Each structure stands twice: as structure tokens, then as C-alpha cells.
């Protein structure tokens, strides 16, 4: 069964540049956020998935795994040698962008060195449109909680905007700020804080209703 919402209804349900504040998510061994928690954020968001499906269509049955396999392979090829980590759990993919590529301390401006890898990622997202894309921003423990939450949201929004400007459909994208709540390294060291200043991109397949 195809998704039944019209494009106009989709626009009403989801205005492209949606932002989400800090929530609890799972993590991979490498530190990228994925797993049971992301089901609530992405795969379990029926209204959002219906809105995206109305625009790009949905996947059915065995096609889901094959589609994500091909997308994962392309992403690994595109990001080889960049330091971007690609993780896979079930039918979801997570990209973790290293701190050296992404943002300086206290900044939400994308570093110039990040443009090339981000362009490669955006080209793959355009080639494989039947996924919801959550852009998740993180901060180190420098500063207070409220400041870091705001900073992480602005970082996620910066990447979201860049992807939209690169041609990724805005209806697919959502920016999420996690503040300092999901560290992958020790915040007591300079190297650890640098590692915690990062952005992750989470991909969840859009599945047809009843599939």
C-alpha cells in the first residue's frame, strides 16, 4: 500500500527545518547515536515518515534491507579516508563526523575542511532519497548546560541547512541538539572535549504503510 498523504498534507505535517531538543538515545560501540532510542526519534515517528513518504515514496519488504545495504556501501566509499565513521545497526545507518572536521570551540560555523566530506554525504543522500535524515549536534562540557544545548542545536541546524542547500529535500531532514549529554570521550581532557564536539547524521528507511 502506498503512503496516502498528499504533498500538501505532508507540508502541513512537517515543515522542513524542524528542530528537536535533547532526548535519550542509544549509542553504537563507536559512539554514534543509534539503536532502540532512535526508533522513537525517527522510525517510530509515523506522522513524519508519512510526510516524507508522500514526497519520496516508501520501501517495501525485502527492498528495505537491500536499499540500505547499497546506501551503506556508497557512504563507506564516499567517506573512505576522511575520518567519518559509518555504523550500521539493523536497517539504520549512523555517520559520525570527527571533531577535527566539524566545528571549532564555541562555534556553530562549519569548518572549511568539512565541506568536501559533507558534499560527498549529501550526494549520497540525494541518490538514496527514501530515508529520514536526523542531524544530531553535540557539545563538550565547556560552558553551562543551557549554553551547550543551544550550541549543539545550532551546530545541527548548520549541517541541516548545508544539506538542504546542497539539494537534499528539506522534508527529510530534522535537526536535533543533544548538548553535552552524549559524550564519547573523557571531558576532563582537551582531546576528549574535542572528540565530543561533533555532529552525527542518522538515516532511517521510509517504509510503505502495511509493508
Go through each PLM region and give its residues.
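Sec-dependent signal peptide recognition
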Residues: 1-10
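C-terminal motif of bacterial Sec signal peptides marking the signal peptidase cleavage site
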Residues: 13-16
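Short, low-complexity, glycine-enriched hydrophobic/amphipathic alpha-helices that associate
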Residues: 18-74
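Stable alpha-helical elements in mature extracytoplasmic
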Residues: 34, 71, 75, 114-117, ...
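Extracytoplasmic
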Residues: 70, 81, 88-92, 96-98, ...
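Periplasmic peptidoglycan-binding/anchoring modules of Gram-negative envelope and division proteins
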Residues: 78, 102, 106-137, 164, ...
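Soluble periplasmic/extracytoplasmic beta-strand elements of cell-envelope proteins
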Residues: 85-87, 92-102, 132-136, 162, ...
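Periplasmic OmpA-like peptidoglycan-binding domain that tethers envelope proteins to the cell wall
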Residues: 138-208
Amino acid at each position: 500500500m502506498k503512503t496516502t498523504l498528499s504533498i500538501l498534507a505532508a507540508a502541513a505535517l512537517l515543515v522542513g527545518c524542524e528542530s528537536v531538543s535533547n532526548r535519550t538515545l542509544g549509542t553504537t560501540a563507536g559512539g554514534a547515536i543509534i539503536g532502540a532510542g532512535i526508533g522513537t526519534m525517527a522510525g517510530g515517528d509515523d506522522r513524519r515518515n508519512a510526510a516524507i513518504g508522500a514526497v519520496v515514496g516508501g520501501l517495501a519488504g525485502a527492498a528495505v534491507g537491500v536499499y540500505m545495504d547499497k546506501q551503506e556501501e556508497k557512504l563507506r566509499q564516499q567517506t573512505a579516508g576522511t575520518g567519518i565513521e559509518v555504523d550500521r545497526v539493523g536497517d539504520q545507518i549512523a555517520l559520525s563526523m570527527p571533531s577535527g572536521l566539524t566545528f571549532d570551540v564555541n562555534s556553530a560555523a562549519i569548518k572549511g575542511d568539512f565541506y568536501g566530506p559533507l558534499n560527498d554525504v549529501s550526494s549520497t543522500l540525494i541518490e538514496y532519497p527514501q530515508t529520514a535524515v536526523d542531524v544530531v549536534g553535540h557539545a563538550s562540557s565547556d560552558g553551562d548546560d543551557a549554553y551547550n544545548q543551544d550550541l549543539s542545536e545550532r551546530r545541527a541546524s548548520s549541517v541541516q541547512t548545508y544539506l538542504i542547500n546542497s539539494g537534499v529535500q528539506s522534508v527529510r531532514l530534522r535537526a536535533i541538539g543533544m548538548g553535552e549529554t552524549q559524550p564519547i570521550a573523557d571531558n576532563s581532557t582537551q582531546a576528549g572535549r574535542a572528540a565530543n564536539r561533533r555532529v552525527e547524521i542518522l538515516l532511517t528507511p521510509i517504509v510503505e504503510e502495511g509493508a
